[in-house]
A protein has these predicted regions:
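Residues forming the flavin
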Residues: 17-192
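Local cysteine-cluster metal-coordination motifs and their immediate loop/turn environment
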Residues: 2-6
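N-terminal juxtadomain amphipathic helix
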Residues: 7-21
Length: 192
């Protein structure tokens, strides 16, 4: 906030915006808005942040939108990459319920090959994100027990959502010495 440049305390924009949104939901100011349909259909491939925004905007323009998601839930990085202590997943679920009530259809566990898109749509939006992390070309990278941040974060978020993993699939750091490469937000999230 620019107020900090004038020796004043900066405003808490994020917190203020969140408080306004929460107040709007608690006071029932947020209502379902079903637009007049234009007769066209759109398939959105990927239900991460970009796919959800595209679906919402297209829906409000009158398109009948169907969202295809490879995983068991929508949200992408919001759901699987951000720890619960930073983003309560009920916020995502609340927004998804609103999108569904406004007419957006979600189809989960759908692996879509972009060379074989589902038939019957007038247009397509491909917003699959990037499931591939940037690999480190360092000695030992191929050893057992070396993981990318999103492997750990995604699994932890899924465990907190009630999913179970076999012992062989589980990324378990308990009782181990752990080295996190990178001190940014993602590295800190892994430590958290």
């Amino acid at each position: 906030c620019v107020l900090n440049l004038m020796d004043h305390e900066p405003t808490t924009n994020r917190e203020d915006e969140c408080a306004i949104v929460e107040h709007a939901f608690s006071e029932d100011y947020v209502h379902v808005e079903i637009p007049e349909r234009n007769g066209k259909t759109v398939a959105v491939i990927g239900a991460g942040p970009a796919g959800l925004v595209a679906a919402n905007q297209l829906n409000h323009k009158g398109y009948k939108v169907t969202v295809f998601e490879a995983r068991e839930n929508a949200g992408g990085l919001l759901r699987y990459g951000i720890p619960n202590f930073k983003l309560n997943k009920s916020i995502i679920d609340r927004r998804l319920r609103l999108l569904e009530e406004e007419g957006i259809e979600f189809r989960y566990n759908q692996q879509i090959d972009v060379t074989k898109l589902p038939e019957g749509f007038d247009a397509y939006v491909v917003s699959t994100g990037t499931p591939t992390a940037r690999d480190l070309k360092i000695p030992g990278r191929e050893l057992k027990g070396v993981y990318f941040a999103l492997e750990l974060l995604s699994q932890q978020n899924r465990i907190l959502a009630g999913m179970e993993f076999s012992k062989d699939e589980l990324v378990n750091c308990k009782g181990k010495d752990v080295l996190v490469i990178g001190g940014g937000d993602t590295g800190s999230d892994c430590i958290g």
